[in-house]
Amino acid sequence: MQRVIIVGSTGSIGTQAIDFILKNRDSFLVVGLAASTQTSLLREQAQVLGTKNTAQGASEAAELIEATEADVVLNAITGAAGLLSTYATLKTGKRLALANKESLIMGGKYFLDMTTFKGQITPVDSEHSAIAQAMKSGKFSEVNKLILTASGGPFYDRESLEGITLKDALDHPTWNMGPMISINSATMFNKGLEIIEAHLLFGIPYSQIDVVIHPQSIVHSMVEYKDGSVIAQASVADMTLPIGYALSWPNRALNAVRPLEWGARQRWDFLPPTENSMRSINLARRAGEAGGVYPAVLNASNECAVEAFMAGKISFARIIHVTETVFNLYTKQHTNRESAKNPIEVILEEDARTRELAKTVIENMSAD
């Protein structure tokens, strides 16, 4: 029986995790729940699961993690708000089922150095879960490259990104996700973040991490080995599988999703990223290779741009423009530097500094 804490329990990943746990109650006991919004749903979840320990807000979620005995924490919080929960999980030696990629991207090497056992960070992202499974087929020294697949989002074939509404951007062709990640998928910025995440989780150089468009979202990612073999993980597009894999690690979850129908006629396409999507991907590579606080700065720049789009302050076409502008301004004004402060304090300070810079950029852009 694994004791589980779920932070971000009322969001897309959190609710799917609870559905999975309710079908596997002999294997999991939820000992803590936390969310930032939807208080009534949080109370309902606690009642259904028989969970006494609940918290609301990012700081309270981290406190809950530190104060509660548990085996695994599912961090399903969206965005930079998940940083403190990842920190608290690693600090207390619990296993981390990580859906909140932003926290790892922000914490980088500092968080990796905090791990105390192999598998302490188990990815929930379908792409990284796929890679983790495919890498069991060979030695690290035998890996030639990682190939992250992407659906391409709703606008892959669209030449112009002008006139795209919020409703359009939230309508993902394959996955049912929260608003922030849906928009990040539409701009392909999410894939850029996943490149940084893959580098951190698996230690593969950025030059050996590729992206390919796979509209069907059946092959979730691949590992190419030096002998020419390619090992892929394929399944129906259902987040229950990577959620179940992360919670059940090192074992596989039983009956997580239905198997693929191999007797049915089907088509798997693999296409190159478009010029529009490469802008996001290349920006993420640049931040990742620079390291230090730069990935956190990039993430904050993008979160502000997406929030501005959702608020109607900028167009969809300007999201990556704003992200790139803010990131470039920050890198011109500030450099990575050693600090005697706690790394978490430094990350939070630079995150806040970036958001102030983004606010000015967005206000000036809105006034044009």
Swiss-Prot record:
Pathway: Isoprenoid biosynthesis; isopentenyl diphosphate biosynthesis via DXP pathway; isopentenyl diphosphate from 1-deoxy-D-xylulose 5-phosphate: step 1/6
One Pfam entry name: DXP_redisom_C
Cofactors named for this entry: Mg(2+); Mn(2+)
Binding-site residues for 1-deoxy-D-xylulose 5-phosphate, renumbered to this chain: K101, S126, E127, S151, H172, S185, N190, K191, E194
Residues that hold NADPH according to the record: T10, G11, S12, I13, Q38, N100, E102, G178
Catalyzed chemical reaction(s): 2-C-methyl-D-erythritol 4-phosphate + NADP(+) = 1-deoxy-D-xylulose 5-phosphate + NADPH + H(+)
Gene Ontology biological-process annotations: isopentenyl diphosphate biosynthetic process, methylerythritol 4-phosphate pathway involved in terpenoid biosynthetic process
Signal peptide: none
Membrane-spanning segments: none
Enzyme Commission (EC) number: 1.1.1.267
Binding site residues for Mn(2+): D125, E127, E194
GO molecular function per UniProt: 1-deoxy-D-xylulose-5-phosphate reductoisomerase activity; manganese ion binding; NADPH binding
Highest taxon above the source species: Bacteria
Keywords linked to the UniProt accession: Isoprene biosynthesis, Manganese, Metal-binding, NADP, Oxidoreductase
Its biological purpose: Catalyzes the NADPH-dependent rearrangement and reduction of 1-deoxy-D-xylulose-5-phosphate (DXP) to 2-C-methyl-D-erythritol 4-phosphate (MEP).
Family, similarity comment: Belongs to the DXR family.
PANTHER family per record: 1-DEOXY-D-XYLULOSE 5-PHOSPHATE REDUCTOISOMERASE, 1-DEOXY-D-XYLULOSE 5-PHOSPHATE REDUCTOISOMERASE, CHLOROPLASTIC
Record's protein name: 1-deoxy-D-xylulose 5-phosphate reductoisomerase
